[in-house]
């Protein structure tokens, strides 16, 4: 059983930072990864890097033994610290205030990664053994006999059991790290970080913060960017939970969009600060990972699609400057459902640079897919943006249909100005109005030939009508002056 004791988690933070230099320098680094779970009670075995996991966690009843202690005493210790009334000290722990703090701590893992934590009681409300134990079991005992010693320690996968120090203060009280939410919450998250395979992190000049730093921080809410990055490298992003989105059959549904619709996802990875309920994370954890998304367009439309690598930049003691937005060269393709016919793709840039397709035409309503993948074996968070618009109506100032744009067309526009609604009445831009915008189209196209049967041949000037340009433009100005 591989074990790592948190000598760094001391009650005195100043002492902890000193101890960090003494004991932690050999291992501390950004996204320090030791190993991961390869088998769990619910997932079975043969789990690989990038696979999501569901881990059961449980609390060892007092007086029972487990891998970390022959006589766990955690429950009474926490009950005393949280002033739980005697009538509420029942065999079921889920009504305790400290249990709620632990549960909130474990819920964060599922919001930011492919790790799902599920509580399972080891005894029922009558105190009878349920026959179940967690993949991660939490208990406690007097670890070193001194109030200034270690707060807790934990084992790495495939074990993950936690032992919390139940040593009381010199006055017999329970220390504040165990009896208030910030301390207990981040202690549980930190130790469980070891329990899922993470090591310690260490930053230069406070350029970032992490719950996996050696000293217990209470100025953050649990897992921060560096912690989340490591979790996603090992277990994938939150979309990998419940079957994942690694194929078109399990694609994440983005929604149904009209020609004014838009969506932006993956926005929580843009900076190093993670709040309690941040759950908008998208990432490619390596070359073996692909992310599929599905969306519906309700009518023919055009779309702008952009894939942007995101992440903060900070400095670590061991690795130097770490730019989390430039870890992988991402690309994407768009497919038509259900045939998976390729519509378009974008793979033109490089590591850390955005890929985009502008004005992509979806000529028919229906379902489409986007597939995202990376070329490097590294985790890369990204943001995906889609915005939809109407299919542009071709501008046409040949109002009389004689295949050229000339003075006759100007006269048609002049007669229809303010009243007309169709092309034959001077509506050049298809907005069912004949106004100054249509006149601008006529001016841009004046002197051009219109050749619908072979549009690829382009348009050429009509020399005979170019001579009309000067007097006609003068006439336009005169009309404007009269209108004024």
Q: Where do the language-model regions lie?
A:
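N-terminal secretory signal peptides that target proteins for export/translocation
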Residues: 1-10, 483-484
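Short, threonine-centered small-residue motifs that mark membrane-proximal processing/anchoring sites
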Residues: 10-30, 389-399, 403-405, 413, ...
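Zinc-dependent metalloendopeptidases
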Residues: 26-304, 316-319, 330-335, 342, ...
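Alpha-helical segments with a strong preference for the paired helices of cellulosomal dockerin domains
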Residues: 100-108, 181, 185-186, 195, ...
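Extended, low-complexity, turn-rich repeat/linker tracts enriched in Gly/Pro/Ser/Thr and Asp/Glu
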Residues: 310-327
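Beta-sandwich interaction modules
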Residues: 353-362
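Short beta-strand-plus-loop segments that form exposed binding edges in beta-rich domains
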Residues: 370-378
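C-terminal membrane-anchoring or membrane-association module
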Residues: 476-484
